[in-house]
């Protein structure tokens, strides 16, 4: 992610799911402080390994940022202070589409019930809202699935979870998927002959400023 495409200045702090560490590496290259949290210990170890490199930037003012990683649950970010984060970037599992950590307790990729998954994502949304500074953004990439040869909309349920937490929807960016060689749809699509889901939603939410009059954003907020 080029510097001109990020809303974080070097002193700002970013929070994200550690995953394979790609985003944390970009934060290091850009000089952005970051915290990576993941429920999977293997993912945290991979992220730490990928962060272990020397970097000599062209920018003379570059300073090596503080980047922390730890094993944790997005539903309980107890090591992160309230209103201390400038940007959240996360790519949660899509219910039980692809197992993430092999039956680790608390892993949402093991939750088969879509209703239960949406309920747990509401807890994630509330924690994201708590740790994010007022006026700052939370970006979340989410996709849908198909069961019994029918489309199952996960994204609108998760969208409603974040609006329920108090967020304002700033953007809905459609991410097209190309050459899907490792998704569940690719595994079963040819056998059962159905249309591949070729996109994901990148939702960008904004936390209102303290005392902000949000009535003008009512169409972009919780409406039910």
Q: For the regions a protein language model found, what residue spans apply to each?
A:
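Class I S-adenosyl-L-methionine-dependent methyltransferase catalytic core
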Residues: 1-224
